[in-house]
Structure formats: structure tokens, C-alpha cells
From Swiss-Prot:
The protein's name in its UniProt record: Gustatory receptor for sugar taste 61a
Keyword line: Cell membrane, Glycoprotein, Membrane, Receptor, Transducer, Transmembrane, Transmembrane helix
PANTHER family given in the database record: GUSTATORY RECEPTOR (PTHR21421), GUSTATORY RECEPTOR FOR SUGAR TASTE 61A-RELATED (PTHR21421:SF34)
Organism: Drosophila melanogaster (Fruit fly)
Function: One of the few identified sugar gustatory receptors identified so far with glucose being its primary ligand and which mediates acceptance behavior.
A GO biological-process term: signal transduction
Gene: Gr61a
Length: 436
């Protein structure tokens, strides 16, 4: 009997030592520094991408290179906000000049796409400034949740959060660069053939002449030279980067939240078939509240970004799909058109599918609760079950729509219906080569 008591005391002593070691490590991680940087946190996963984004005036945060998220703050008097202001000024001038040219020539469903692209870019710069202002209120609770769930009793996932973020983000970046290069290649080919067939007096066709036409809004206020061409590439690239980063940021955020909810579900699932004291259910329910509060905070801060992203993607898909049955002039035009359309569809689907994992993972603990025997169904279990089913957990666009699988297929059905209607309305003839 005494031997059994000694074994129990030793077991409890070892358990208390492990708990104290975990608490001490959590405390050191909460102070920032090397211990926190070595953890697989969401801040550590997205920090390299935020550093790159600041070169384009996105997410104007101070001390973004710091390993401690407590040092990263939004400041009005900062270099990051000054860079954002510069992009807003230059982008605003480009948008106004472009709008003036379009209104002079006459607006239609085809040429307004470029103006919408610029306006969406301006709105997104402002949206990311707003998100940067609430950064500290989001990232500090998120980091505390990361510290909580990267130690026992929670288990880490098979793949690290950083590897998931890197694979998806870098894949989108590489495909986006290809799309951007094909845009210029297709435009230059069309311009060259147009000059050859319509202006026989032009003996030389250079890329510079194409850029003068492509950046006509910039040449409207600047002389044509190497500086204005580089400026045009730079500003156009910034708008393109912002357009892609908007979706990448939603994807990265969705991966970060979904992974924590999956870890939480795994902890609850590990209790299946075991007698669980009410105190443990209380601890689990308290952790779930922290997770849901974090998800709600992120959803409220990102609603404008999600709304603009989905609305813009749907508009561009509709506009591009309208030209599916249009006979294009050159092979490079076909390559660019299909590459761009498929890439946009894939990127939009990626946004919905990754974001839907948040909601799916938040409901996983219900499976384990349904297996709790009736004699173990306590008041805490009932509260936890009510908590899981009481409200939606995930991302949305101002609560007008939620990013779920059902929303994705509903959007695709709407696109097909809308596209069929547009194809009936669009009665323009594309025959012949216009030499305007």
C-alpha cells in the first residue's frame, strides 16, 4: 500500500514539475525575444510578407522587423505611413487622370475595367491603413493564444503554420508574376500587329512606343523618357501587388485561425471515451471562448478587406468571362486570357476554401460532444455545446455573406446565370480589325 502511495506521489510530483516548466516557458515566450521567435506563431509566419508589403505602402506599421509583436505598432509619425501617403497621392493622381481620359473618350463595359482596378487599389490602401490601426488589439491576443496552444495539453499539427503559409503565398506570388508578364507580352503583341496592319508608314516598332501608349495617363502629365517609363512600371506593379496581396492576406489569416481551431478540436477529440471532470470541461470551454473572441475580433477588422476582395473578384471574373466566345487576334492573347481567367478563378476559390476551414474546424468538437455518455453530460458540457452552435465563426464581408463552401458554390451559380444574361445582351460585333 505504501509503495502504491509513493508511486502516486512521484507521478504527481513529475506532473507538477512538467506543469511548472510549461508555465515558465509560456511566461518567457510572453516576454518576447528568442523563445517567442522560435515558436510556430502566426506573427512569425506572416512577418516576412508584411516587410515586403511595406515597400508598396501596405500595412504601415512601425518596428515590423521586431521579433516581439508588442513592439509592432501603428504610428501616425512613421516612415511606413509616409510611404502609404506617397502611394495614395501618386495613385490618386493616376486614377483621376485615367478617369478624365476615359470620360473624354467615352465609357463602356470594356474600358472601365482599368478604372475599377485603380479605384479598388485606392480603397485597399485605405483598408489596410485601417487594419494597421487595430493591429495591436488583434496581434497581442493572437500571440497569447499561440503561446497557449503551442504547449501541452495541445498538440502541434503535422505541418507547421509557417510551411503552410509559405507554400500557398509563394505559389500565388509566382503565378501573379507570370500573369503580370503575360499582360505586357499580350499588349505589346497586339500593339505591334495593330501598327503593322493599320499604319504602314511606321518602319520601327519599339517596346518604348508601346509603353507610351500603355502609360498614356502618366504621359499626360510627364514627358516621355526612361524615368517616366520606370515610374509607370513601378506604379502599375504596386497596384497589381496590392490586388494580389489582398487575397494572399485573407488566405494567410484563414490558415492561422483554422490551424488553432483544428488543434482545439484535436484536444477535445482526445477525451473521447474517457471520464472528464467538470473542471476540465470548464478549462476547455474557457479556451474556446478565447479562440472565438479572437476570431470575432479578426472578422470585424477584416470585413472591409473581405468585402472588397470578393466584390472585385466577382466583377473581374464576369468581365473576363464575357470575352470567352470572342475571337482573339493572336495566340499570345489566348494564352494571356485563359491564364489570367483560370488564375483569378483559382485565387478566388482559394480564398473561399481556406476561409471555410475556420468554420469547419470550429464545429469539429461537436462530434466528440455527441459521444459523451448521458451520465457525463454535465452543465459545463451543455454550456460548451451551446457555445459551439450559438453563432457563426469565420470570416465575412460585413456579415452580408460568409466565406464558406456553400457561399463559393452559390457565387459560382450566380456567375453562370449572370454570364448567360450578359452574353445575350452583348451584341457587339468583333469581326474585322479596327484601325482607329
Amino acid at each position: 500500500m505504501s509503495r502504491t502511495s509513493d508511486d502516486i506521489r512521484k507521478h504527481l510530483k513529475v506532473r507538477r514539475q512538467k506543469q511548472r516548466a510549461i508555465l515558465a516557458m509560456r511566461w518567457r515566450c510572453a516576454q518576447g525575444g528568442l523563445e517567442f521567435e522560435q515558436l510556430d506563431t502566426f506573427y512569425g509566419a506572416i512577418r516576412p510578407y508584411l516587410c515586403v508589403a511595406q515597400f508598396f505602402g501596405i500595412m504601415p506599421l512601425s518596428n515590423i522587423r521586431s521579433r516581439d509583436p508588442q513592439d509592432v505598432k501603428f504610428k501616425v509619425r512613421s516612415i511606413g505611413l509616409a510611404v502609404t501617403g506617397l502611394f495614395l497621392l501618386l495613385g490618386g493622381m493616376k486614377t483621376l487622370v485615367g478617369a478624365n481620359i476615359l470620360f473624354t473618350e467615352g465609357l463602356n463595359a470594356k474600358n472601365i475595367v482599368g478604372l475599377v482596378f485603380l479605384i479598388v487599389g485606392m480603397v485597399n490602401w485605405l483598408n489596410f491603413v485601417g487594419f494597421a490601426r487595430s493591429w495591436s488589439h488583434i496581434m497581442l491576443p493572437w500571440s497569447s493564444v499561440d503561446i497557449l496552444m503551442l504547449f501541452p495539453p495541445y498538440k502541434r499539427g503535422k505541418r507547421s503554420l509557417r510551411s503552410k503559409v509559405n507554400v500557398l503565398a509563394l505559389s500565388v506570388v509566382v503565378l501573379a508574376v507570370g500573369d503580370h508578364m503575360l499582360y505586357y507580352a499580350s499588349g505589346y503583341c497586339s500593339y505591334s500587329m495593330h501598327i503593322l496592319q493599320c499604319h504602314t508608314n511606321h518602319s520601327r516598332i519599339t517596346f518604348g512606343l508601346y509603353l507610351e501608349k500603355e502609360f498614356s495617363d502618366i504621359m499626360f502629365i510627364m514627358p516621355f523618357n526612361i524615368f517616366s517609363m520606370c515610374y509607370g512600371f513601378w506604379l502599375n506593379g504596386a497596384f497589381t501587388f496590392l490586388w494580389n496581396f489582398m487575397d494572399i492576406f485573407i488566405v494567410m489569416t484563414s490558415i492561422g485561425l483554422a490551424q488553432r481551431f483544428q488543434q482545439f478540436a484535436a484536444r477535445v477529440g482526445a477525451l473521447e471515451g474517457r471520464h472528464v471532470p467538470e473542471a476540465l470541461w470548464y478549462d476547455i470551454r474557457r479556451d474556446h471562448i478565447r479562440l472565438c473572441e479572437l476570431a470575432s475580433l479578426v472578422e470585424a477588422s477584416m470585413s472591409n478587406i473581405v468585402f472588397v476582395s470578393c466584390a472585385n473578384n466577382v466583377y473581374v471574373i464576369c468581365n473576363q468571362a464575357l470575352a470567352i466566345f470572342t475571337k482573339l487576334r493572336h495566340p499570345i492573347n489566348y494564352v494571356y486570357f485563359w491564364y489570367s481567367l483560370i488564375f483569378l478563378l483559382a485565387r478566388t476559390s482559394l480564398v473561399f476554401m481556406t476561409a471555410s476551414k475556420i468554420h469547419d474546424a470550429s464545429l469539429l468538437p461537436l462530434r466528440s460532444l455527441y459521444l459523451v455518455p448521458s451520465d457525463g453530460w454535465t452543465q459545463e458540457v451543455q454550456r460548451f455545446a451551446d457555445q459551439l452552435t450559438s453563432e457563426f465563426v469565420g470570416l465575412s464581408g460585413y456579415r452580408l455573406f460568409c466565406l464558406t463552401r456553400k457561399s463559393l458554390f452559390g457565387m459560382l451559380a450566380t456567375l453562370v446565370t449572370y454570364e448567360l444574361m450578359l452574353l445575350q445582351i452583348d451584341a457587339k460585333s468583333h469581326k474585322g480589325l479596327r484601325c482607329a
